[in-house]
């Protein structure tokens, strides 16, 4: 190999990255799209489980996998059997609102329920409520999107920002209503950038709901949010922050919480609608995880040897992972002061060191450059005889590594044919400049693949052979303290952390007297292990008794306390 061969250094360095195991990318599901508690109601709407939609990239509206609920109305006042298509979390507050709209006859008492002022005061919300009532009776394929409040700002002007709708949910709706569950309030007027003019509200002690017409709903989920200006009817005085909070967030005395507003969007019918439920609730299933995209095939190489080698590496190590760019903490000043010189991989010492080890990368610095800073003169092969001996050594080691690789258990079926083809293509034409490089490259690649496959075997056997020897340094099997952080479990309010304990230590014969309740089975296993017998699953130190723990959790609408069993380990033993 004449002259400095930096190309080989680059190839071998790349092989180190190429031989690292990689796995295809996996799509990650959002964990929030889970079924919630069944909502109970006393009216005529059948509301069962409420659902969140998953990540917007995981489903398309109108497809067979829409995460929607089909809700069927029943009762004497409704003859329709068509289901309601609802997307989003339908809490008991929205259920009560829709029940009230469905039952109302728009008399004076009904108008009071919705804080609608008497006729003649210009109420744009009344026609919209009547259209919503018509949809509840005859949905006609239209579907309702429920968006809940995400953020509120009080100063200087109240700003309400809601959830962003799912894909397709932001299309122009037939109607958009801001539904508020008010507390005690006064007669007020409401204006805002997303509202069609001034809307009047006449709140009384009998008002349960407050609805506002929104003509530009897209501003409700975009920053800064939906701006509202509330003034007293008559004198036009602005409401204070305390009055606004009491009006817009009514108290829920049953659950000791506040009722948050919701934005309802009624969207037009789509061509692909699910079949009617015929009196039953159907849930269109959530989308299954998408299969990971197939790895991009490398472009065909002009060299069949390199193309076959790439296929073998991917067959054994898996497709290359899309790793983030490496970040090296290098000091430019230190690098500038480092001795500069040529790296010569044709140097006899370099080649011998490369063959003596199995690492695909070798970093060399000539001794003269390290001491004096003067670059060393590149040295060529010692003699043709030495070069021939080195070639024979490469060929012998190549055949030995290939034989070991073929004998490894669990090898993919595609690997042996690819390996045979590589050996047939190597060393190729000995007179060509790439002949020696090809043999050396294949040797280092096969050594790396062999090391990786052996590492997989060792990790697998280590998982299966969790024996007493590995835990001997920790003493005999005994109960150890372990604190568990529950703050990641968002539904658990109290406690934030608790002492769960864990079991750790060696399982050997004779057993420790810390847990006298032995089983005959584990005694026999421990005696076999003491006699030197190999067990596929040696006895492990595990909890044998538990106690419960009182947890205070937050469900959709209430705070509850539960005594959860098997939360704290109290005894340990070998099993």
From Swiss-Prot:
Q: Name one Pfam family in it.
A: TGF_beta
Q: Which GO terms describe its biological process?
A: anti-Mullerian hormone receptor signaling pathway; gonadal mesoderm development; Leydig cell differentiation; Mullerian duct regression; negative regulation of ovarian follicle development; ovarian follicle development
The role this protein plays is: Plays an important role in several reproductive functions. Induces Muellerian duct regression during male fetal sexual differentiation and plays a role in Leydig cell differentiation and function. In female acts as a negative regulator of the primordial to primary follicle transition and decreases FSH sensitivity of growing follicles. AMH signals by binding to a specific type-II receptor, AMHR2, that heterodimerizes with type-I receptors (ACVR1 and BMPR1A), and recruiting SMAD proteins that are translocated to the nucleus to regulate target gene expression.
What processing steps or modifications follow its translation? Preproprotein is proteolytically processed to generate N- and C-terminal cleavage products that homodimerize and associate to form a biologically active non-covalent complex. Binding of the non-covalent complex to AMHR2 induces dissociation of the pro-region from the mature C-terminal dimer. The N-terminal portion of the protein, despite having no intrinsic activity, has the role of amplifying the activity of the C-terminus.
Where does this polypeptide localize?
Secreted
Q: Which Gene3D superfamilies match?
A: Cystine-knot cytokines
One MF term in the entry's GO annotations: growth factor activity
The entry describes its oligomerization and partners as: Homodimer; disulfide-linked.
* Protein name, UniProt field: Muellerian-inhibiting factor
Q: Which UniProt keywords apply?
A: Differentiation, Disulfide bond, Glycoprotein, Gonadal differentiation, Growth factor, Secreted, Signal
Q: Which residues form the propeptide?
A: 25-466
PANTHER family recorded: MUELLERIAN-INHIBITING FACTOR (PTHR15009:SF4)
